[in-house]
Structures are given as structure tokens and as C-alpha cells.
């Protein structure tokens, strides 16, 4: 009875030695072929032949324009990425047998996804928002609202929020408060404002007076010319009639008019004198 368990143990160990269990897993950087672990090909190389009991795995280098970037058992290499200029792409870094080509977008554009297969325009931050992070070839613009004390009045992919103007540092007073879209408006202090406004008003009044004086001087010239015209010229323009040289004298005689004839002396009788 004691020998039976010993016999079972003996035959079990013998069968295990003759018929070993097939492998189901291999070490890192190995792959399983027909229950045998073969070494993988390194990056930049592809598989040509699997290993045998006494022969190691056969690999060969990827051709130009191809690559494999990991340890592998691939029989074909991958083609390098093509950076299509029609999509706004250009080569940022040339590919090798171990790495793929890196594409990036032209200026003002960024990739639409992680693979950078196409490009799109950078976003603009509208008024009230400033640029927190400038866009790159692989990322879009990041905008941030302008906090209190700052403003942005343009749409831009570069401009950050600007601080409000400090009126006090300029010796001015605040006329209008700022917002996230507009700057503070400054103005002169009341006393300074008067010193500025009064000379301006005086200057305007002086100009008005000078203009008025010039206008009056121009208007008076023709009037003076008429008032002091040469009398000889008037006579030439308007000659006197011939009978007006020696007008007929008239006297009264007994309340009756007496006409003095031309060429005779005028005499009055004694009675008339009395």
C-alpha cells in the first residue's frame, strides 16, 4: 500500500519530462512562434525570418521613407507621413528609420488634431477678452476675460489685456470710468481746466473783433469816396441852363409883383421908399 503513491509520483514526473507543457508567454522584447520564443526586431528594422531552435530571428533595416518606432515582429515598415502644403502643412522634422516625419502648420494656423493631418486659422480674442496663451502650430489661442482694472478694445490673437490709464500719475482727474472693453478717460483738473479754457475763449473773441474791424473798414471806403467827390466833376456831369446865369428879379409894388427887365437898373421911387 505504501509503494502505490510512490509509483504514481514517479510516473508523473517522468511524463512531465518527456512531454513538457507548451509555452504561453515569453519575456519582454520576444514573441511566440510554434511554442518557441523568438527575439523581436529593434526599432528601424522589420522581420525577415522567425527564429529556429539554433538560429536567431532575422531582421533587416527599413528603406528610405519608411520607419518602425518600436520593438516589433512586423514584416513591413510604415510609410513616413506626408505634410501636404495644400492643407497648410510643412515639415517640422524629417523622419528616420525609427521615427515618423513631424508636420506642423504654417504661420497663423494650428493643427486640428494630435496627428496634425490638417490646419485651421487661429482664433481671435474679441474685445473684453485678452490672450492668455498665444497659439502655436499645434494648439489654438486661449482667451481669458479681462479682470477689473484691465481692458481690451480689439479682436486679436496676440494682444493681452491692458491696464487702465492712471489719471493721478498724469496730474489729471477721471472723467469717465473704464470697462473691460474701454480705457479710463482723463481730463484736466477744474482750476487747470479754467486756465486752459479762458485763453482759448479770449483768443476766439480777439479773432472775431479783428475780423469785424476789417469788414467795417472795407464797407466804409466806398461811402467816403462818394462824399468827397470833386465838385468840378459834378458840374460837368450836370451843366446849368443858360437862363439861370442872370435870373429876373421881382419886387412888389402895392402888393403887386414888378418884374425888372433885363438890361435896366432897378430904381425905386421916393414914395415907395417912404
Curated annotation (Swiss-Prot):
Residues 1-20 form the signal peptide. Pfam families: TNFR_c6 (PF00020). Keywords: Disulfide bond, Glycoprotein, Immunity, Membrane, Receptor, Repeat, Signal, Transmembrane, Transmembrane helix. It is found in: Membrane. One of its GO terms (cellular component) is CD40 receptor complex. GO terms for biological process: B cell activation; immune response-regulating cell surface receptor signaling pathway. Disulfide bonds join 26-37, 38-51, 41-59, 62-77, 83-103, 105-119, 111-116, 125-143. It is a single-pass type I membrane protein. SUPFAM superfamilies: TNF receptor-like. Residues 216-274 are cytoplasmic. Glycans are attached at residues 153, 180. PROSITE patterns: TNFR_NGFR_1, TNFR_NGFR_2. It comes from the Eukaryota. TNFR-Cys repeats lie at residues 25-60, 61-103, 104-144, 145-187. One of its GO terms (molecular function) is signaling receptor activity. The keyword Nucleotide-binding does not apply. Receptor for TNFSF5/CD40LG. Transduces TRAF6- and MAP3K8-mediated signals that activate ERK in macrophages and B cells, leading to induction of immunoglobulin secretion. Monomer and homodimer. Interacts with TRAF1, TRAF2, TRAF3, TRAF5 and TRAF6. Interacts with TRAF6 and MAP3K8; the interaction is required for ERK activation. This is Tumor necrosis factor receptor superfamily member 5. It comes from Canis lupus familiaris.
